[in-house]
Amino acid sequence: MLKMTLKEVLESIKPKDEERKKVKLIMDELRGIAQEVIEESGEEIEVKFVGSLAKDTYLSGDHDIDMFLAFPLSIPVEKLKSKGLEIAESIGKRLESYEISYAEHPYVRGVYKGYQVDIVPCYNVRDWREVRTAVDRSILHTEWVLKNIKGKNDEVRLLKRFLKGINAYGSEVYRRGFSGYLAEILVIKFGSFLKVLEKADFMLRQKIIDPENWLKREPEIAMKTVKREIEEDKPIIVIDPVDPRRNVAANLSWERYGLFYFKAREFLTKPSTELFFPRDKKGNYLEVLRRKGTHLVTLTFEPPNLVDDIIIPQVERTAKGLARQLELEGFRVLGIDYGRDFIFLEVEEIERPRIKIKKGPLYFTHHGLRFFDKNDIVWIEGKELASEKSSLGFIVDVLEDILRKGQFSAGKNVKDAIVGANIIIDFVPKALAQEAYLFLSREKFRVK
């Protein structure tokens, strides 16, 4: 049963010969275009392909191409950015379409014969000591995987498809799952897809995975990495095989690892292709609200034009800050969710009493006299004072007051946008209906 299931999955995700030939042809053509532009520029630049296509760990139909323009180390960073973008843009002009995108430094994203191509300037590094920009390691990652994969390419494909199926794939900040490189490392380390699943509990308890023995080779640097990641409470620490300063699993959240933890156990107990290819989780968020008897507060806003890596963590911080303030104001917040341009807050009630009763100090103390002077309605309960104060009752009024005063923890780039947010109760724009359902039904991280 287990072997048959894996065979069936592999047949649908492994690229056929015709697809492989087409991918190779496209990459060869892109290399030719890039080299023509480089020759015309007179620069010494090497064209290198990185990522799953270069490593042959890609899934059928997943054809995003990463083409790196590797500059000599002698080039200053500023020149790398300016000249790199100039050459990348010249290549982009020879494709069907292109646009300039921004990460640590600008790069070009284009389309060539239906294939998405990222053209990224970087340094032509040989080891971790030469790394100057975040993207430089990608060359080393590709070289390490090619050297160590030893025919386990299909095992990596199975793990990637499994992680996609359980919604735990992708290390982007809005997902915080397993990266493709992390999946490759785990298969190389443990030997197969099934063995990685069997180690789900072991990895969590061992905590540290060190494929290249950096803790022995570079103990001071590697231990610094381990201590930093433990302090940040990461689920697992996978010391990058090509750089002891980095945890490959740094972006992996406890929630996404939890999905892997339970779904691995489920698959080993009851193998099924459905974990690889699940049915869409669709439903009506309004029905969920009626069933639960709770309320959904939605804030929608226009975020600044910055990349998700900057925006999403700041929206997360703001959502948590607003939830804390609502709790302090007497509203019970049952959960939060967020995206680039929205925040969801599930609350138990949207109305609270319109008065606040506050217990005060002993009436015959200095603090008691201050309490008496400060409040309008004051009475005695035994030796202590108490006061009554009018307050806003409706959650929208309370939230608007919190936003207006700015007394909440927020990301600096998004605070102004969120202060002017639209606040909606028990209804969301059509574009957010599915997100609202997944959030309210707990399907997003549901394991039972």
From Swiss-Prot:
One GO term of the biological process aspect: RNA repair
Entries under CDD domains matching the protein: NT_2-5OAS_ClassI-CCAase (cd05400)
Binding site residues for CTP: S52, K55, H141, K160, Y169
Cofactor: Mg(2+)
Chain residues that bind Mg(2+): D64, D66, D118
Broad EC category: transferase
Positions annotated to bind ATP: S52, K55, H141, K160, Y169
GO molecular function: ATP binding; CCA tRNA nucleotidyltransferase activity; magnesium ion binding; tRNA binding
InterPro entries linked: CAA_C (IPR048833), CCA-adding_arc (IPR008229), CCA_tRNA_nucleotrans_2 (IPR042090), NT_2-5OAS_ClassI-CCAase (IPR006116), NT_sf (IPR043519), NuclTrfase_I-like_C (IPR011068), Polymerase_NTP_transf_dom (IPR002934), tRNA_NucTransf2 (IPR015329)
Keywords, alphabetical: ATP-binding, Magnesium, Metal-binding, Nucleotide-binding, Nucleotidyltransferase, RNA repair, RNA-binding, Transferase, tRNA processing
SUPFAM superfamilies for the chain: Nucleotidyltransferase, PAP/Archaeal CCA-adding enzyme, C-terminal domain, PAP/OAS1 substrate-binding domain
EC number(s) stated in the UniProt entry for this protein: 2.7.7.72
Catalyzed chemical reaction(s): a tRNA precursor + 2 CTP + ATP = a tRNA with a 3' CCA end + 3 diphosphate; a tRNA with a 3' CCA end + 2 CTP + ATP = a tRNA with a 3' CCACCA end + 3 diphosphate
Note: A single active site specifically recognizes both ATP and CTP and is responsible for their addition.
Family: Belongs to the tRNA nucleotidyltransferase/poly(A) polymerase family. Archaeal CCA-adding enzyme subfamily.
Function noted in UniProt: Catalyzes the addition and repair of the essential 3'-terminal CCA sequence in tRNAs without using a nucleic acid template. Adds these three nucleotides in the order of C, C, and A to the tRNA nucleotide-73, using CTP and ATP as substrates and producing inorganic pyrophosphate. tRNA 3'-terminal CCA addition is required both for tRNA processing and repair. Also involved in tRNA surveillance by mediating tandem CCA addition to generate a CCACCA at the 3' terminus of unstable tRNAs. While stable tRNAs receive only 3'-terminal CCA, unstable tRNAs are marked with CCACCA and rapidly degraded.
SUBUNIT field: Homodimer.
Name the record gives this protein: CCA-adding enzyme
Gene expressing this chain: cca
